[in-house]
Swiss-Prot record:
Gene that this polypeptide is encoded by: rnz
Organism of derivation: Metallosphaera sedula (strain ATCC 51363 / DSM 5348 / JCM 9185 / NBRC 15509 / TH2)
Catalytic activity: Endonucleolytic cleavage of RNA, removing extra 3' nucleotides from tRNA precursor, generating 3' termini of tRNAs. A 3'-hydroxy group is left at the tRNA terminus and a 5'-phosphoryl group is left at the trailer molecule
Name by which UniProt lists this protein: Ribonuclease Z
EC number(s) recorded for this UniProt protein: 3.1.26.11
Residues given in the record as Zn(2+) 2 binding sites: D64, H65, D200, H256
Residue positions binding Zn(2+) 1: H60, H62, H132, D200
Length: 291
């Protein structure tokens, strides 16, 4: 099971919604996607332990997505963190942090590693290109598929040799009597959970192709229908819903809500006309995803 926490679902100017921050958790692994101003305060006040964050993935260097990161890292240092922190992000992120730390007289006292992708404990985090007004990337969080052997079927067919079963599970074909046992005939594949987060983006083919079939898509929905979001490199609710429909995702979270909207009911209504499995998460809500 994966758990997605919607820490900050707003964007741009502060509002009743926090600035962008989304936490994905699975069995001891915590991945923070974007870190707007105030992220660590919200997490600490709501018992989301910042020290458990293993990976931080930043989409781009606009202030509302990244300015909470230097202070979060400094707090981790003050709490005497020892574990390595992995950071993914666009070009310039490392320089931004280095200069901020120098000018605020802080030197990280735990290992920080900047990586282009991350894989551990059966989870992979990798970027995909988005369509914003500055260099920007979204992220896929993917759980590996698992394969279990249909031992009952094998027994019915008289195959009980554990060595044969092991070879089939390893994906190898096995000669058996006058035929060949093929692994695809006896393996039951359980598809892993897949989550996609766009950060800020226009609707575009690169995003659609990257998020095909995910279980949950968190897509920029800054404005309601009727506003030209292209000038700002953002999307409307109907544009986000169209991406979700074309990419055949399972669920759509409308995020990065502009501060101008206190009531998102019309935004949600617009999206659901196109993609019924849309929702607008509130700050500090969460969603459990099961394969």
């Amino acid at each position: 099971m994966m758990k997605v926490y919607f820490i900050g679902t707003g964007g741009g100017a502060p509002s009743r919604r926090g600035l962008p921050a989304y936490l994905v958790r699975r069995e001891g692994l915590s991945i923070l996607m974007d870190c707007g101003e105030g992220t660590q305060i919200t997490m600490i006040r709501n018992s989301l332990n910042i020290m458990n964050v293993n990976v931080i993935a930043i989409t781009h260097l606009h202030a509302d997505h990244v300015l909470g990161l230097p202070s979060l890292i400094q707090t981790m240092g003050m709490y005497d963190r020892k574990e390595r922190l992995y950071i993914l992000g666009p070009e310039g992120l490392k320089d931004l942090l280095t200069e901020t730390f120098e000018r605020t007289y802080f030197s990280p006292n735990f290992p920080i590693e900047f990586v282009s992708s991350y894989e551990s404990q059966g989870i992979r985090v990798r970027p995909f290109r988005t369509c914003h007004v500055v260099p920007s990337q979204g992220y896929l969080v993917e759980e590996k598929d698992t394969a279990n052997l249909d031992a009952e079927r094998l027994r019915r067919e008289g195959v009980t040799d554990w060595r044969v079963m092991r070879m089939l599970k390893e994906g190898k074909e096995v000669p058996w009597g006058d035929r060949v046992l093929k692994p695809e005939d006896y393996l039951i594949v359980k598809r892993g959970i897949r989550i996609a987060y766009t950060g800020d983006t226009r609707p575009c083919e690169t995003v659609i192709n990257s998020v095909k079939g995910v279980d949950l898509l968190l897509h920029d929905s800054t404005f309601e229908q009727g506003i030209d979001a292209s000038e700002y490199g953002h999307s409307t609710s109907t544009e986000a819903a169209t991406v979700a429909r074309e990419a055949e995702v399972k669920r759509l979270a409308l995020i990065h809500i502009s501060a101008r909207y206190r009531d998102t009911s019309e935004m949600l209504k617009q999206a659901r006309r196109i993609f019924p499995m849309s929702f607008v998460p509130e700050d500090l809500s969460f969603l459990n995803l099961r394969a």
